[in-house]
Curated annotation (Swiss-Prot):
Residues 5-70 form the J domain. Its main location: cytoplasm. GO terms for molecular function: ATP binding; heat shock protein binding; unfolded protein binding; zinc ion binding. This is Chaperone protein DnaJ. SUPFAM superfamilies: Chaperone J-domain, DnaJ/Hsp40 cysteine-rich domain, HSP40/DnaJ peptide-binding domain. Its cofactor is Zn(2+). Zn(2+) 1 binds at residues 137, 140, 189, 192. Disulfide bonds: none annotated. GO terms for biological process: chaperone cofactor-dependent protein refolding; DNA replication; protein refolding; response to heat. A zinc finger (CR-type) spans 124-201.
Length: 368
């Protein structure tokens, strides 16, 4: 069966850059990787095809040979080049699927989300959390063996991986004899069935520092899942989710809030009290204050969890229209409104005057 064109395999043009090749290979490998498609022979074949195509096209010398001679360039061998390290591309996405020593493995990382009120996030808090996880089997002490005896795998010699030669390419894959463990267990533990780990719940006390924000993560080293065969456990990542607050909205270390005032307060000026994180504060509103005016209270925001500097509190004035008026109040407002009649009204409502002038100018242009 003839091989497909390497560029076609990765879905890129022949002018593709090194970065384009890397992105295309990453998409292809993640789609067809055997760990995501267990038992799917077609996916495994597609994965190998993608890997072979990338190893050639990502190497400058090999790509030049391929562009000139096609697949025939490699029928009798090919010179060595700077073939990219697959581990550099994927890191830990598939747990070093392309190689690496068995001793470098560790347990899986665990994620946990904790919800806080804004006040808790600002001040810091200590929380007790309970997480489902895999822990070391106490019956076999993590060995997976009922009698504690394990044999080094003779196929991979304890590495958990075997080297496969496919033409000019050498690949590492999980040892089929020991399943990647590097050891053979003849008498599996009756409690964990040879896994060396059992499901359990772990209770931890997590100290959340003052100033954390929505999406911040706290890493607890070694508190993740216990690794197989006694290898170190992974880490626990506690992600912070801050609930919406009825008064404040947070923007980094700054806080924002709306301060409702009456029309009379905005027109005549007044002193209003506003809530802050550490009590009340006063804002002096000058006469003729418009809705939307911002007042800044320095240092009344959130103390940064990283720099220990404090943000500010921004208070936005909202001039409220009075509701549920009495007959007397309505009469007074009607009398007040009459005082704005005529040309003098423009000087009392500059924004309205500007708006009306703009509307008139617009219609004049439309009808001219």
């Amino acid at each position: 069966m003839s091989k497909r064109d390497y560029y076609q395999v990765l879905g890129v043009p022949r002018t593709a850059s090194e970065d384009d090749l890397k992105k295309a290979y990453r998409r292809c490998a993640m789609k067809y990787h055997p760990d995501r498609n267990p038992g799917d022979a077609a996916a495994e074949a597609a994965f190998k095809e993608c890997k072979e195509a990338y190893e050639v096209l990502a190497d400058t010398k090999k790509r030049k040979l391929y562009d000139t001679h096609g697949h025939a360039a490699f029928e009798h061998g090919v010179g060595s080049g700077n073939t990219p390290d697959m581990n550099d591309i994927f890191g830990d996405i598939f747990g070093n699927i392309f190689g690496g020593a068995r001793a470098s493995r560790r347990g899986a990382d665990v994620g946990y989300m904790v919800e806080l009120d804004l006040e808790e996030a600002v001040a810091g808090v200590e929380r007790q959390i309970q997480i489902p996880t895999l822990v070391e089997c106490t019956h076999c002490h993590g060995s997976g063996s009922e009698d504690g005896h394990v044999e080094t795998c003779g196929t991979c010699r304890g590495s958990g991986q075997v080297r496969i030669q496919r033409g000019i390419f050498a690949m590492q894959q999980t040892c089929p004899h020991c399943g990647g463990r590097g050891v053979i267990i003849r008498n599996p533990c009756k409690v964990c069935n040879g896994a060396g780990r059992v499901e359990d719940h772990k209770t931890l006390s997590v100290k959340i520092p003052a100033g954390v924000d929505n999406g911040d993560r706290i890493r607890l080293s070694g508190e993740g899942e216990q690794g197989p065969d006694g290898v170190p456990p992974g880490d626990l990542y506690v992600e912070v989710r801050v609930r919406e607050h009825p008064i404040f909205q947070r923007d980094g270390d700054d806080l924002h809030c709306e301060v409702p005032v009456r029309i009379s307060q905005a027109a005549l000026g007044d002193i209003v009290r506003v809530a802050t994180l550490d009590g009340e504060a006063e804002i002096r509103i000058p006469a003729e204050t418009q809705s939307g005016k911002l007042f800044r209270l320095r240092g009344k925001g959130v103390r940064s969890v990283r720099s220990r500097t404090e943000g500010d509190l921004y208070c936005r004035i909202v001039v409220e229209t009075p509701v549920n008026l009495t007959a007397e109040q309505r009469k007074l407002l009607e009398q007040f409104e009459m005082t704005f009649a005529g040309e003098d009204a423009r000087k009392h409502s500059p924004k309205s005057a500007t708006f009306l002038d703009g509307v008139k100018s617009f219609w004049d242009r439309m009808t001219s």
